[in-house]
Amino acid sequence: MNIKQAKEEIKHTVTAYLKKDDEGRYKIPLIRQRPVLLMGPPGIGKTQIMEQIAEECKIGLVAYTITHHTRQSAVGLPFIKEMEFAGKEYSITEYTMSEIIASVYRKIEEGCPEGILFIDEINCVSETLAPTMLQFLQCKTFGNQAVPEGWIIVAAGNPPEYNKSVREFDMVTLDRVRCMQVEACLLYTSPSPRD
């Protein structure tokens, strides 16, 4: 499909996921919403269509290029907490809120209770962040914080022929997302004139 068709498909998906019943509950609960995975060459407008969809649907958009992040900014920073188990005191590791999830909550506080969480270059992450991204797509969480209800996950990546650092997703992950393959639209291009 081309980028225009992808935009319409994603817009349709967002609209369906945000429909509510008479009691104000989402008709498709968060647990049943499959993240959208948009795969296509760089520079075809994947990020731009997310901005357009958010504007047209009058919802928020939080966009991150995940290759600029570390495991700590995605999952949160570790800290030690004392807890008691079976009458004995233990030091355990907990995590602060993910920078990405915190950005969604900031957007909610700004008046956008619904929106799109867009993660770009999801299949180009470092080796240490790859398991976190798989967990994100499968469980809709970063660390121990879930994506809030009303926020739709859309991720984008590039095929391996465009980026040598691409990591392939396993079949289990691909089974849990709605994958769209987008090709460059050559409608407005013409061969360059030769002298």
What is the meaning of each model-derived region?
Residues Y188-D195:
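Conserved small/polar residues in nucleotide/adenosyl-binding loops
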Residues N2-R34:
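Pre-Walker A (pre-P-loop) alpha-helix and adjacent loop at the N terminus of AAA/AAA+ ATPase modules
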Residues I59-M83:
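AAA+/P-loop NTPase substrate/partner-engagement loops
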Residues T128-A146:
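Conserved catalytic/switch belt of AAA+ P-loop NTPases
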Residues E84-I116:
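Conserved alpha-helical scaffold flanking the Walker A/P-loop in AAA+ ATPase domains
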Residues R32-H68:
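Walker A/P-loop
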Residues R167-A184:
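A short helix-turn-beta junction within AAA+ P-loop NTPase domains corresponding to the substrate/partner-engaging
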Residues Y95-T96, Y105-K107, C112, G143-N158, ...:
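AAA+/SF3 P-loop NTPase mechanochemical coupling elements
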